[in-house]
Regions:
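Domain-terminus/edge residues, biased toward the C-terminal soluble/receptor-binding domains
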Residues: 136-137, 148-153, 157-316
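Active-site-adjacent loops and short helices of periplasmic peptidoglycan-processing enzymes
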Residues: 2-171
Length: 316
């Protein structure tokens, strides 16, 4: 559901952006959220998800090792963000994932993709299939890293759906997205330490993810999330003009959600809401409850106007 932007007293300097309250699912802000974007390194969220799903199902282990191909190595020499792996290196899935998540290594993406699916092209098919499963209706993946390709596209709304899935289904692995650095103890060379590229992690605001992106055709992008006092917000923006504006505007958007809206717990799944009469049953009444916690996000100025009602329409 969406809270109308007519409330909004904020303008985000991005080509497209969206903000969601995680628990309620309410959209608190949107700006052209369904226009096509080139997701750049935000693509790596899906690359990671494919691996996490396989690990969760028992079909892949963090200790499994993949051999680096020449194709993967070439990406480390082409000026892209890299883990700096070498042809023939045997690298664990765990190290490759850290190289993808923290160092944003395009070379690590290809090594992981080839190790899982045989070729990067086959891996991209898995990525697109997963996107469709998640309801990412305007997304297609053509590679594992997000390097420029007209067939590698998405929307900020779809990136939001992907980010929600990551946080919901893989909370333990999601913690890796908040790590500030990763050291690659490579064979036959000095260790390489790289810092996380997400600027919000270095601010004292509760940010714990997710992934930056940059392409010349798209400018700067960021999928970000913070959690404060148990409340999580997710923001996705693309088309920021500079690195500084990406950091500033993303911070502004998340802060807007925190300061202008409250998250209200309507009902816990374990709590009885009411009792209803039973016709010709063993009991005269049964308890009524919901099967999941219900949350509502509401503008702070309208919080006192919130009313909850139960409507019982009888047995079906």
């Amino acid at each position: 559901s969406s809270i109308s932007n007519s409330y909004s007293n904020i303008e985000i300097k991005a080509r497209t952006a969206i903000l969601q309250d995680f628990l309620s699912g309410e959209i608190l802000y949107e700006k052209d959220p369904d226009i096509k974007i080139y997701p750049a390194s935000m693509t790596k969220i899906m690359t990671s998800i494919i691996a996490f799903d396989l690990i969760k199902s028992g079909d892949l282990s963090l200790d499994d090792k993949f051999i680096v191909s020449e194709k993967a190595w070439r990406l480390s020499t082409a000026g892209y963000s890299s883990m700096f792996i070498m042809v023939g290196d045997e690298i664990s899935v765990e190290d490759l994932l850290h190289g993808i998540i923290t160092a944003s290594g395009n070379d690590a993406c290809v090594a992981l993709a080839e190790g899982i699916a045989g070729t990067e092209e086959e891996f991209a098919i898995l990525m697109t299939a997963k996107a469709k499963e998640l309801g990412m209706e305007n997304t297609n993946f053509a590679n594992s890293s997000g390097i420029n390709d007209p067939d590698n596209y998405s929307t900020v709304r779809d990136i939001l759906k992907m980010s929600r899935y990551l946080i919901q289904k893989h909370p333990d692995f999601y913690e890796w997205f908040s790590l500030l650095e990763f050291t690659w103890d490579r064979t036959g060379g000095d260790p390489i330490t790289q810092g996380n590229r997400n600027p919000l992690l270095y601010k004292n605001m509760g940010a714990d993810g997710i992934k930056t992106g940059y392409l010349a055709v798209e400018k700067y992008s960021l999928a970000s999330s913070l959690i404060r006092n148990g409340r999580r917000l997710i923001a996705v923006g693309s088309g920021f003009e500079t690195k500084n504006s990406r950091s500033r505007e993303s911070s502004k958007l998340l802060t807007y959600g925190l300061t202008n809206f409250d998250l209200v717990e309507i009902n816990k799944s374990s709590e009885t809401i009411d009792k209803v009469d039973v016709w010709l049953g063993k009991e005269n009444q049964v308890d009524v409850y919901v099967n999941e916690d219900i949350f509502k996000t509401i503008k702070k100025a309208k919080k006192n106007l919130l009313k909850v009602a139960l409507k019982y329409e009888g047995p079906r």
